Design a protein with these regions (language model features):
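Short acidic-hydrophobic, aromatic-tinged amphipathic segments that line or gate anion-handling sites
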Residues: 96-100, 147-162
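Flexible loop/turn segments at secondary-structure boundaries
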Residues: 36-40, 75-80, 104-107, 123-125, ...
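A donor-sugar binding/catalytic signature common to diverse glycosyltransferases
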Residues: 100-148
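C-terminal amphipathic helix plus adjacent low-complexity
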Residues: 1-24, 154-194
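Nucleotide-activated donor-binding/catalytic signature segment of Leloir-type glycosyltransferases, i.e.
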Residues: 83-99
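Short, structured coil segments at secondary-structure junctions
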Residues: 64, 91-93, 111, 129-130
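Conserved catalytic-core segment of nucleotide-activated headgroup transferases in glycan assembly
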Residues: 2-87
Length: 194
């Protein structure tokens, strides 16, 4: 059964039954990709693969003394993705690890400073909730100005530094443009019909 909100996952990331209380502070939320997905589906990214991305990102954030939370991808059911996620959890035990079943609303209610995803739909969700979204490379929202998209690894870490320092020029209330983007990407896009 496919979720009517997002046609590639089974469960809604906004399930109100899963509004578990998150006790810890969250400065930055990292949304893991499905590690079996193509890392360069939208063009050549600034990292070679998801492994390089997540490890360099976490190390950089740790050096800035931030409260970091990581949420696994809702489609994390493929064995190789689970194995890699478990290796990350063992390596970064001090971080807050959130289940894929926790509603994104519970996360957004914690008001993190910013959120990071390689190219996930959560980027427009973050912007919708007025939380700074930072991608790690090409993504479906590059034509819009509500997601920060780097062109190089150096620029990626500059964007994160500026987000930490509250120096990114993030204009809030992009709801109309986000609705347009959502329509074009999920409802009007014929790729899913073929």
């Amino acid at each position: 059964k496919i979720n009517p909100e997002l046609n590639y996952i089974k469960k809604s990331p906004y399930n109100k039954k899963n509004l578990f209380k998150i006790d810890k502070k969250i400065d930055v939320i990292i949304f893991l990709p499905d590690f079996s997905d193509a890392p360069h589906i939208y063009g050549k990214g600034v990292f070679n693969d998801f492994s390089e991305w997540i490890q360099e990102t976490v190390e950089f954030l740790k050096s800035n003394n931030l409260s970091i939370a990581i949420k696994e991808h809702p489609n994390n059911w493929i064995y190789s993705s689970k194995v890699f996620k478990n290796k990350l959890k063992n390596k970064y035990k001090a971080l807050t690890w959130l289940s894929k079943d926790i509603s994104n609303l519970a996360i957004f209610n914690k008001k993190p400073i910013f959120g990071i995803s390689p190219h996930g739909t959560v980027l427009h969700e973050l912007a919708y909730h007025n939380i700074i979204p930072v991608a790690s490379g090409p993504n479906p929202y590059m034509s819009y100005n509500f997601v920060f998209t780097p062109k190089s690894k150096k620029e990626y870490f500059v964007l994160i530094t500026k987000a930490i320092q509250n120096k990114l020029n993030f204009k809030k209330n992009h709801k109309e443009k986000i609705a347009e983007c959502y329509y074009m990407y999920f409802l009007h896009n014929g790729d899913y019909i073929k």
